[in-house]
Amino acid sequence: MLKIAICDDEQPIREYLKRLVEKCTEGEIRLFADGGELLADPTAFDLILLDISLNREQNAAEPDGMETARKIRERSDALIIFVTALREYVFEGYDVGAFHYLLKPIDEQKFTEVMDRAICQIRSKKNVEPLVIKVGGNYVRIPVDDILYAENQARKIMLHTKSKKEP
């Protein structure tokens, strides 16, 4: 089941986005009014729909959407789709690794197309079989996306992963 976060300072927009997401897929959908709430949630989200202009007038201490995306990117590879009225941040959005950038008012057909592509990418990543290697007399399963690179050392292959090396 997909874990999806929707973060927008306007409650009607959050509810509208939730309805659109529910038309596209099933999953656990969590709603957030600001970036601070989203960042405080320990859930490992697969997909995050994020407004850039989160209302900082009410609480200037809260991060805007771009700052929130940067902090998310430090700890997660969740797909981020910006949903905003601000055209001027489109290139900066891709600098933080956004999957897509949708402009308000939302074109429902475009939203569905982007969601379909995002869901396919998430599911294909989740369905990758781990690499099984023999280490000594034991078999070890290594997630493919955890492998950084392989190195040949005296007729042995050394896999360097995000967590450790495997001979």
Predicted segments with their positions:
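Short loop/edge segments at beta-strand edges and connector loops
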Residues: A33-D34, L103
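Conserved binding/recognition cores within well-folded domains
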Residues: D116-P167
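Non-catalytic signal-transmission and effector/linker regions of two-component phosphorelay proteins
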Residues: M1-A5
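CheY-like receiver
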Residues: G27, A40, F45-K126
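Residues immediately C-terminal
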Residues: P12, N55, Y149
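Two-component/phosphorelay signaling modules centered on CheY-like receiver
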Residues: E10-F32
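Conserved SAM-binding loop
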Residues: I6, L31, F82-V83
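Short alpha-helical segment
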Residues: G35-L39
